[in-house]
From Swiss-Prot:
GO cellular component: ribonucleoprotein complex; ribosome
Designated name of the protein: Large ribosomal subunit protein eL43
Sequence similarity: Belongs to the eukaryotic ribosomal protein eL43 family.
Zn-finger region bounds: C4-type: 41-62
Length: 96
């Protein structure tokens, strides 16, 4: 017997069938795609950073544990802060 899947458009959120409404299932699909995507480790640059729990990410190669966002290793706010810190460090190195 062949299993039939109703997940062509909605992806993994198809497991909920017609429950909860389309918008919520689409949002869930987008979050799950981000969450399961392969990310690079900031320590060793190996592309196998995996989510262990909420905001906890572990590299398969070097074993580095990183605290990040709930669904992605680096949040939008974290990127902004990192850029600001880099600018400050660069401006101080230019002064010297």
């Amino acid at each position: 017997m062949v299993e039939f899947s109703h997940t062509k458009k909605i992806g993994s959120a198809g497991r909920f069938g017609s429950r909860y409404g389309r918008k919520i299932r689409v949002r869930l699909r987008d979050v799950e795609i981000k969450q399961k995507k392969e990310y690079k480790c900031p320590v060793c640059a190996f592309p196998k950073l995996k989510r262990v729990g909420t905001s906890i990410w572990v590299c398969d190669k070097c074993g580095a544990k990183i605290a990040g966002g709930a669904y992605t290793p680096e949040t939008g706010a974290g990127k902004v802060v990192t850029k600001a810190i880099r600018r400050v460090i660069e401006s101080k190195s230019r002064e010297i």
